[in-house]
Amino acid sequence: MRGSSITLEDYTLEEGLRIFRDAGFDTIEMWRPQLRRCKTDELRKKFVAYAKGMGILMGGLNVVGEDYYQPFGTDQQLEQTLTNLMADADFALSLGTRDVLIWEGVAPKGTTEAHWMSQLLPRLIELFRTATNALRSKGVRFLVEPHPFTVGMSDQFLIKLCDALDPGQFGITFDFCHYGVGRPNDYLEAIPALGHRIRNIHFSDTDQKTSELHFPPGAGRLQIQAMLEAFRGIHYDGTLALDLYAYPTPVQALPLGAARVREACEFLGLPY
């Protein structure tokens, strides 16, 4: 069963791994800031061995929100974004995982979807095409995670981005909370629209008002069962991770969340 380490951002690595293990999780998506002390490849390998000894495997590297990621800035910022994205890919590989979780980009203030399509989409395609081509032999995959304030909340934008890239190296992380806030009236419709491009789910709930506040599934306002039915309708066969980022009592909520993950995976026919 898969979880997201950012859920326990206030805990040490050792504490977080123990809490996840005791709640029944065996695979974790690691948030990069929590690995700030793993400065060398050797230290990262030691951390991975420590986690494995506790029964925890690495399920991806989450670098969403890193300051370097400025694909819509100057040409120099775009180049720096590429350089750091490649470095994060190597970081992920040193953990023994191929997946780099990133966001596609914050929408510049005052811009429209038409501007995103004509001016920003080509830059993103160039960025990820260059990165995936360079990393093809290493098997790295980028999974972009739309947020309520990013350009990927537009299905049209996200579909064109995905379809311009190798599906074996690029896909979507569909976060229940983000879509519930960013698309409060039509989040269900986004699932069949994006379809096979979705390769990872961040399973959570939301009050549909507060951005980034991930409730345990079933504790918010989303139509969770209808969303799962939509995923079954597209024959979803990717991964699913519990994400309780910003929830005030994550340790208390983990067992309930774990039960909901098991139910969701059984419903979708996914391993857990």
Language-model features: locations:
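Hydrophobic residues within beta-strands of alpha/beta enzymes
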Residues: 28-29, 59-61, 100-101, 201, ...
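Active-site acidic/histidine proton-transfer and metal-coordination neighborhood
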Residues: 12-15, 52-53, 70-171
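Histidine-acidic metal/acid-base catalytic patches
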Residues: 1, 7-24, 96, 155-174, ...
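Flexible, glycine- and charge-enriched loops at secondary-structure boundaries
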Residues: 13, 37-44, 74-82, 113-121, ...
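Active-site beta-loop-alpha junctions enriched in small/polar residues
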Residues: 4-8, 31-35, 63-66, 105-107, ...
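Catalytic-core regions built around general acid/base machinery
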Residues: 42-53, 124-135, 190, 226-230
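A short acidic, helix-capping loop that chelates divalent metal ions and anchors anionic groups
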Residues: 67-73, 108-115, 180-182, 209-214, ...
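Glycine-rich, proline-tolerant flexible connector loops at the mouths of alpha/beta enzymes
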Residues: 29-52, 107-108
